[in-house]
Amino acid sequence: MAQRRFFVGGNWKMNGNKESLEELMSTLNTASLHEDTEVVCAAPSIYLDFARSGLDSRISVAAQNCYKVAKGAFTGEISPAMIKDCGADWVILGHSERRHVFGENDELIGQKVAHALESDLSVIACIGEKLEEREAGTTEDVIFAQTQVIAENVMDWEKVVLAYEPVWAIGTGKTATPEQAQEVHEKLRAWFRANISEEVSDSLRIIYGGSVTAANCRELASQTDVDGFLVGGASLKPEFIDIINARA
């Protein structure tokens, strides 16, 4: 069994200004963070430079999205090369808000994953079902189909973290119970064992995203197949430190 390093990503989404983010970064920089936890903060693209220069080197920086090619006439998009040039090492791809607010489909997300990895960015690849899909009993069908397209575009799984984010639990205050999260993570790990390899199944970090707070993070972190979190709103608050230290 591979030892999987606990991973906590903070997705700032479209929030903050220089003043508030500087205050947040100062709080993180002076906090006692569990050394066995990998921490990544995903800043709005316009603040990537600001975040990288302002955060302690023990905290990595991610972009929240990128495009599938290196350059060109794609107004408003940013490339993995640009993200790297700002000093960031990670990118979030396939987030439910990109899928459901901006209409990104599995094929496009797969192409983005492939290009980001080719460009030497590490990827937080997101999957997850909507409430109606869970209620219809199709959770596995949905997340396995999403995972399949991502997997077709990954050559090196060492640079990928898979984030399971039930869409019904994002920003709603609803959270999957620790048992619900563990059940899905366990099924995902079994999918990788059956479809990719035993080695990838054992080593791949599968993290949970969906209204993670200081109040529920420890119980979620205690689950065997939950290897960390992708945190939204709480990553902008001091409680993010408690979430980072959920396994301390």
UniProtKB/Swiss-Prot annotation:
<dbReference type="InterPro" id="IPR000652">
    <property type="entry name" value="Triosephosphate_isomerase"/>
</dbReference>
<comment type="function">
    <text>It is also responsible for the non-negligible production of methylglyoxal a reactive cytotoxic side-product that modifies and can alter proteins, DNA and lipids.</text>
</comment>
<dbReference type="GO" id="GO:0019563">
    <property type="term" value="P:glycerol catabolic process"/>
</dbReference>
<keyword id="KW-0324">Glycolysis</keyword>
<dbReference type="GO" id="GO:0046166">
    <property type="term" value="P:glyceraldehyde-3-phosphate biosynthetic process"/>
</dbReference>
<protein>
    <recommendedName>
        <fullName>Triosephosphate isomerase</fullName>
        <ecNumber>5.3.1.1</ecNumber>
        <ecNumber>4.2.3.3</ecNumber>
    </recommendedName>
</protein>
<keyword id="KW-0456">Lyase</keyword>
<dbReference type="InterPro" id="IPR013785">
    <property type="entry name" value="Aldolase_TIM"/>
</dbReference>
<keyword id="KW-0963">Cytoplasm</keyword>
<feature type="binding site">
    <location>
        <position position="11"/>
    </location>
    <ligand>
        <name>substrate</name>
    </ligand>
</feature>
<dbReference type="InterPro" id="IPR035990">
    <property type="entry name" value="TIM_sf"/>
</dbReference>
<dbReference type="InterPro" id="IPR022896">
    <property type="entry name" value="TrioseP_Isoase_bac/euk"/>
</dbReference>
<comment type="function">
    <text>Triosephosphate isomerase is an extremely efficient metabolic enzyme that catalyzes the interconversion between dihydroxyacetone phosphate (DHAP) and D-glyceraldehyde-3-phosphate (G3P) in glycolysis and gluconeogenesis.</text>
</comment>
<keyword id="KW-0312">Gluconeogenesis</keyword>
<comment type="similarity">
    <text>Belongs to the triosephosphate isomerase family.</text>
</comment>
<dbReference type="GO" id="GO:0006094">
    <property type="term" value="P:gluconeogenesis"/>
</dbReference>
<dbReference type="Pfam" id="PF00121">
    <property type="entry name" value="TIM"/>
</dbReference>
<comment type="subunit">
    <text>Homodimer.</text>
</comment>
<keyword id="KW-0413">Isomerase</keyword>
<dbReference type="GO" id="GO:0006096">
    <property type="term" value="P:glycolytic process"/>
</dbReference>
<dbReference type="GO" id="GO:0004807">
    <property type="term" value="F:triose-phosphate isomerase activity"/>
</dbReference>
<comment type="pathway">
    <text>Carbohydrate degradation; glycolysis; D-glyceraldehyde 3-phosphate from glycerone phosphate: step 1/1.</text>
</comment>
<feature type="binding site">
    <location>
        <position position="13"/>
    </location>
    <ligand>
        <name>substrate</name>
    </ligand>
</feature>
<feature type="active site" description="Proton acceptor">
    <location>
        <position position="165"/>
    </location>
</feature>
<comment type="pathway">
    <text>Carbohydrate biosynthesis; gluconeogenesis.</text>
</comment>
<feature type="active site" description="Electrophile">
    <location>
        <position position="95"/>
    </location>
</feature>
<dbReference type="GO" id="GO:0019242">
    <property type="term" value="P:methylglyoxal biosynthetic process"/>
</dbReference>
<dbReference type="GO" id="GO:0005829">
    <property type="term" value="C:cytosol"/>
</dbReference>
<dbReference type="InterPro" id="IPR020861">
    <property type="entry name" value="Triosephosphate_isomerase_AS"/>
</dbReference>
<dbReference type="GO" id="GO:0042803">
    <property type="term" value="F:protein homodimerization activity"/>
</dbReference>
<dbReference type="GO" id="GO:0008929">
    <property type="term" value="F:methylglyoxal synthase activity"/>
</dbReference>
